[in-house]
A protein has these predicted regions:
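Phosphate/pyrophosphate-binding active-site segments
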Residues: 1, 136, 204, 300-398, ...
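N-terminal alpha/beta PP-like core and its mobile active-site loop of ThDP/TPP-dependent enzymes
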Residues: 1-347, 363, 382, 470-475, ...
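Active-site diphosphate/adenylate-binding microenvironment
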Residues: 7-10, 15-17, 25-28, 33-37, ...
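Active-site nucleophile and cofactor-binding loops and adjacent substrate-binding regions
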Residues: 25-27, 46-56, 71-78, 133-134, ...
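Thiamine diphosphate
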Residues: 99, 108-114, 263, 270, ...
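Generic enzyme active-site microenvironment
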Residues: 158, 305, 395, 448-449
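Short, internal active-site loops enriched in acidic
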Residues: 163-166, 400-401, 548-549
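Conserved short loop/turn motifs at secondary-structure junctions
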Residues: 217-221, 368, 450
Length: 574
């Protein structure tokens, strides 16, 4: 008999599935796993200071590398601390496998110390959850977990292993290393004949259209079809609108790029969608922040929806044609059916909206030197320029700065813009940034966070320092929960209820962690400070104290249509 433990089997299964890095925090019910991990040096473990940080780090690692991220936690509070991170990954289609310890099998259901039914808790925010009842099931469960996490629309999968199963011995010779295949967990694809018929119909609609628009989401990045998208747009002279999570699917410098649509999208993106006679949604969810009021979205357009996930079709928006298939294969079939086109009349109309675009995006005139108190958008524009210059990965937290960065970012490679889009989880950026940097050690990574979101996960600075991760961290400090304050200004008569916040002296905080830190509060400090920060070898912290009551525009209010944008000139006076 060649005996091994369940914990050792779990470590070997992770290696076999291609895992290289684990983000986690140990505890009692997961101790056998951590003991086995000691004998598996090929599995790098990153000790996060909070389990939510571990989940976000696994998410950032997965987005930056295209590989499945792995996070680890103990039972009870350790496992429940993962939930926000798993929900963020679930909403944005990020492949993550979460490994949790559970109390020993006899204690399940008895309210044992640190017992939580974590499989039950995470049902709404995972693709599937496994409670491993037998040690011999471990190899198959991990095989299936990784397959499910990465297949179809990616997402998180949970593997919960009781402590006694981790410690149990099993004869290796009796094990099957192949994964169990549960047919009920796999969505049956459309037949080739159905897909071909759908593609023919899409081609007909596109070739007859006078005012088509491509609405692009994260599915383009996940399917690796940015090249096909660019070819389609160039060949058929198509305007391209990119969602928050699809910004890096199409070059911002391409003349056909109209930017981000939706609540804080560009005028030309929103007006183009509203005036279109055909909207082709490629790997996009048509969520409320993108389309505005559903019954008034693109009122004269036929809607085509390409998505690998059948449950995404008509979840929020009608679809005249739905193509449920891998986007790469769908576009491969569509491209030969689409001839070259000249859409000059449509483009002339779009150029009129271009001329009305936000004047604050105009570059400064030659010789211009910015002076005076620092503006938030001005600060973020400078950071965005540094990100583009170095082909860096941009990781944004949630709030006003998230929208400004999305508006200002230049060209980015697919997988280079990371943010919590669907869930909007504050505290995401710092741990996701460290995960991205570990996954892409040869690329610079910039974290952009507000003072509110930064304080939700700043304990991960200790992880950054311990692991020697050269993050560039820019904190936009306006002394408010900025996006909430903006809504209070517009809709609640400037009654700023519990949105003004204080924070630590970040120079002192950086010193406490041994991180070089700069404080900026004037425009003339920007360029020199960012240049210094960019060349530091280790992590750096840039504290940007900006004007307090700056707002993000344009803005489409909740319940409004995309062409009912409020611009800076139309803001309600205080």
């Amino acid at each position: 008999m060649v005996a091994t433990t369940g914990a050792d089997l779990a470590c070997r299964a992770l290696s076999r599935e291609g895992a290289q890095v684990l983000f986690g925090h140990p505890g009692g019910a997961i101790l056998p796993f951590y003991d086995a991990l000691y004998n598996h040096p090929s599995l790098r473990h990153v000790l996060c200071r909070h389990e939510q940080g571990a989940a976000h780090a696994a998410d950032g690692y997965a987005r930056a590398t295209g590989r499945t991220g792995v996070c680890v936690a103990t039972s009870g509070p350790g496992a429940t601390n993962l939930v926000t991170g798993l929900a963020a990954a679930f909403m944005d289609g990020v492949p993550v496998v979460a490994v949790t310890g559970q109390v020993a099998r006899p204690g399940i259901g008895t309210f044992a110390f640190q017992e939580t039914d974590i499989v039950g808790v995470t049902i709404p925010v995972t693709k599937h959850g496994f409670l491993v009842q037998e040690v011999s099931d471990i190899p198959g469960v991990f095989s299936e977990a990784f397959r499910l996490a990465a297949s179809g629309r990616p997402g998180p999968v949970l593997v919960d292993i009781p402590k006694d199963v981790q410690a149990a011995l099993v004869d290796e010779k009796t094990l099957s290393l192949s994964g169990r295949k549960n047919p009920e967990l796999v969505e049956p694809p459309e037949s080739t004949q159905e897909i071909e018929a759908d593609i023919q119909q899409v081609a007909k609609l596109l070739n007859e259209s006078q005012r088509p628009v491509l609405l692009v989401g994260r599915g383009v990045i996940l399917s690796g079809t940015s090249g096909k998208l660019s070819y389609l747009a160039e060949r058929n002279d198509l305007p391209v609108v990119t969602s928050l999570l699809g910004l890096d699917a199409f070059p911002a410098s391409d003349p056909r790029a109209l930017g981000m649509p939706g609540m804080h999208g560009t005028e030309r993106a929103n007006y183009s969608l509203q005036d279109a006679d055909l909207v082709l949604g490629l790997g996009v969810r048509f969520d409320d922040r993108v389309i505005g009021r559903p019954d008034r979205f693109a009122p004269n357009a036929r809607i085509v929806h390409f998505d690998v996930d059948a449950t995404a079709i008509e979840r929020t928006m009608r679809a005249d044609v739905a193509v449920v298939a891998d986007l790469s294969e769908s576009l491969k079939m569509l491209l030969p059916l689409v001839p070259k086109a000249d859409r000059s009349a449509w483009w002339e109309r779009i150029r009129e909206w271009n001329r009305e675009a936000d004047p604050t995006k105009e570059p400064p005139r030659p010789g211009y030197r910015r002076m005076g108190p620092l503006g938030a958008r001005e600060a973020i524009r400078s950071v965005a320029r540094k990100i583009s210059e170095s082909n860096a990965i941009a990781v944004s937290d949630v709030g006003q700065h998230q929208m400004w960065l999305a508006q200002e970012l230049g060209d980015a490679l697919p997988g280079s813009h990371l943010t919590s889009g669907g869930l909007g989880a504050m505290g995401y950026a710092l741990p996701a940034g460290l995960g991205a940097a570990i996954g892409q050690p040869d690329r610079s990574v910039w974290v952009v966070a507000g003072d509110g979101g930064f304080q939700m996960s700043l304990q991960e600075l200790a992880t950054v320092v311990q692991e020697g991760i050269p993050l560039r961290i820019a904190v936009i400090d306006n002394g408010y929960l900025g996006m909430v304050r903006q809504w209070q200004e517009r809709f609640y008569g400037r009654r700023y209820s519990e949105t003004q916040i204080s924070g630590p002296d970040l120079v002192a905080l950086g010193k406490a962690y041994g991180i070089p830190t700069w404080r900026i509060d004037r425009s003339e400090q920007l360029d020199s400070t960012l240049s210094l920060a960019a060349i530091e070898e280790g992590p750096v912290l840039i504290w940007m104290q900006v004007r307090q009551e700056e707002n993000v525009y344009p803005m489409v209010e909740s319940g409004a249509a995309l062409d009912e944008m409020v611009t800076e000139s139309e803001r309600v006076p205080g």
